[in-house]
Curated annotation (Swiss-Prot):
Belongs to the UPF0677 family. S-adenosyl-L-methionine binds at D124, D153, L154. The keyword Signal does not apply. InterPro entries: Ppm1/Ppm2/Tcmp, SAM-dependent_MTases_sf, SAM_mthyl_Trfase_ML2640-like. Exhibits S-adenosyl-L-methionine-dependent methyltransferase activity. PANTHER family: S-ADENOSYL-L-METHIONINE-DEPENDENT METHYLTRANSFERASE YKTD-RELATED, S-ADENOSYL-L-METHIONINE-DEPENDENT METHYLTRANSFERASES SUPERFAMILY PROTEIN. One of its GO terms (molecular function) is methyltransferase activity. This is Putative S-adenosyl-L-methionine-dependent methyltransferase Mjls_1072. GO terms for biological process: methylation.
Amino acid sequence: MARSDEDSWDLASSVGATATMVAAARAVASRGPEALIDDPYADALVRAVGVEYFVKLLDGEITLEADNAAMLAVMTDVMAVRTRFFDDFFLSSGLPQAVILASGLDARAYRLPWPSGSVVYEIDQPEVIEFKTRTLADLGASPAAELRTVAIDLRDDWPRALRDRGFDPTAPTAWIAEGLLIYLPPDAQDRLFDNITALSAPGSRLATEFHPDAGARIGASSQRMAEEWRRHGLDLDMADLFYDGERNPVVDYLRERGWEVEARSRPDMFAHYGRPFPTGEAVEALRQSLAVTATRR
């Protein structure tokens, strides 16, 4: 089903199901002695959502055709590298405030070693926030920093909701927008960065990722995966969730608004973390993706 300005979701449907998919990839990527990441909560969160396909995937009960199995392995590696990039961003920022936009099943507030006095804000749809908070509490997990959830759709007035939860716009902040931009219309992407800029004191930092020609390139490979998923009973076509249209390049957009920006390609990020970047047609859509970090002047 195509997106609309008023659509909503839980963690088993639409955009929310992609958060569960990413958590499943993090759970798989956390296994083994050479795992690049360690997310001890991802597996339990995915099982709590209860989407049968993702649970079977965790249990090794899904058999995919060769091309799709290879694509799944690539996506698991991509999520491992992406997760580690954002983990390292927070760990290196040293800032007292952190904001996770569209937090989904992100458990960084619980699993990262935050400095004493850190405050972490998570912003997402109310149902998503409630589910994750309740599930982690049931698991006996406690946040490793002061966690303040902001239950609001990013299409609404989230800056006001964030300030109402105690956010201090005069203090430097570390922001992440992970796996988010492709699900926003181009004009909403611009508004997101405008709002972040307005809320960011000098010294604030931002990490995100940008996929040039995202809709066309990633949509085609997503459709192939959707066909495979349907064979296993999962009705999720990610291509329907992406917004097409020409986007302002993130690097240029941020620089024009007072940020010092660095960008690294996905193959460079793989090399940085000691992982070979895969080859083949299936991964060409991923090659152009950029890991972006910025500091507010």
